[in-house]
UniProtKB/Swiss-Prot annotation:
Binding residues for [4Fe-4S] cluster 1: 64, 67, 70, 114
Broad class of where this protein is predominantly found: membrane
SUBUNIT field: NDH-1 is composed of at least 11 different subunits.
Disulphide bond pairs: none
Subcellular location(s) of the protein: Cellular thylakoid membrane
Catalytic reactions of this protein: a plastoquinone + NADH + (n+1) H(+)(in) = a plastoquinol + NAD(+) + n H(+)(out); a plastoquinone + NADPH + (n+1) H(+)(in) = a plastoquinol + NADP(+) + n H(+)(out)
Family annotation (Pfam families): Fer4_7
Gene this chain is encoded by: ndhI
Protein family (similarity comment): Belongs to the complex I 23 kDa subunit family.
Any one Gene Ontology cellular component term annotated for this protein: plasma membrane-derived thylakoid membrane
Protein name: NAD(P)H-quinone oxidoreductase subunit I
Residues at which [4Fe-4S] cluster 2 binds: 74, 104, 107, 110
4Fe-4S ferredoxin-type domain ranges (all copies): 55-84, 95-124
Comment on bound cofactor: Binds 2 [4Fe-4S] clusters per subunit.
Annotated source species: Prochlorococcus marinus (strain AS9601)
Amino acid sequence: MKNFLQQINSYIKEAFNAGKYLYNGLSVTFDHLRRRPVTVQYPYEKLIPSERYRGRIHYEFDKCIACEVCVRVCPINLPVVDWVMNKETKKKELRNYSIDFGVCIFCGNCVEYCPTNCLSMTEEYELATFDRHNLNFDNVALGRLPTNVTTDPSVKPLRELAYLPKGVMDPHEIPASDTRVGKLPEEVYDWMRPESNKNKDKVSNSNN
């Protein structure tokens, strides 16, 4: 009789522990059911980076003293500092400064150790290009002020239009006659070309 009661007691404890574990797991699941979706339909929707986000590096040419500290602290010796020694002033004269963001790991060491604070991290993260050589930014491109995501014109319409219609991002079972959500590279190129060049192409095609 005593062994029977002990077995029942152990069975009840195991059932209680199993129910407790099940409750803990389902509580997390049900908690997420009450939340809004967190999926971001990029590039139609964009996230606002945090204050310490390590995005594209901003460079101030006038502050740089060509000390090359950024090159020494970089794990891959990435920044290219082109300078010459001025024999009259016996000081370095900076000619060009460049960073290849196709190789950069955005560790922030160059910004941390710069003695003149001529380097800073921005919130700009849209660096995609059709040619990888375009990711090599010189001092002019690095000196360009970053685009603020909060004032980006492509973000504002989404606040007004809320979410895109259902199925607009789904690539399956869409007729070939329907227009694409985005444009192909050649379509963007045609859109950016001047009207005079387009008219010349039309005339040449008609003559052929």
